[in-house]
Regions:
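Fold-independent oxyanion-binding glycine-rich loops
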Residues: 31, 50, 67, 92-93, ...
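Beta-loop-alpha module in the N-terminal Rossmann-like domain of NAD(P)-dependent dehydrogenases
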Residues: 63-79, 96-99
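NAD(P)+-binding Rossmann beta1-loop-alpha1 motif at the extreme N-terminus of oxidoreductases
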Residues: 1-61, 86, 115
Length: 120
């Protein structure tokens, strides 16, 4: 399976590493270029932007967003705008569940699937 990861802090980096060990292909992006270099050195692919991350992936895409809750909604929207019907965007942060219900309703007409899997 191929998975995109937006946000390569402690949790996103750890998830990419575990997924790579399990045999999955990962593409990662973080606004901190050093975080991207770190996962590339661990065997993942890196991207310099969210657009590049999506462009490296094969449909149907699954993009996991692991950013602080304050930024999750805007990043999920940015990712979803680049996806196609049938793709999946995952909010893995600790966003308020009500915000995620609203995001799911907002994205439903686009055909992009939204999954809330709070991990912290």
């Amino acid at each position: 399976m191929q998975l995109g990861m937006v946000g390569l802090g402690r949790m996103g980096n750890g998830l990419v590493r575990r997924l790579q060990v399990a045999g999955h292909q990962c593409v990662g992006y973080d606004r901190n270029a050093e975080a991207v270099i770190d996962i590339v050195e661990a065997g993942a692919s890196g991207a310099a932007s969210i657009e590049e991350l999506v462009g490296q992936m094969v449909a149907p895409r699954a993009v996991w967003v692991m950013v602080p809750a304050a930024f999750a909604g805007s990043v999920v929207r940015e990712v979803a705008a680049l996806l196609e019907p049938g793709d999946i965007v995952i909010d893995g942060g600790n966003s308020n569940w009500r915000d995620d219900v609203d995001l799911a309703e907002e994205l439903a007409p686009t055909g992009v699937h939204f999954v809330d899997i709070g991990t912290s």
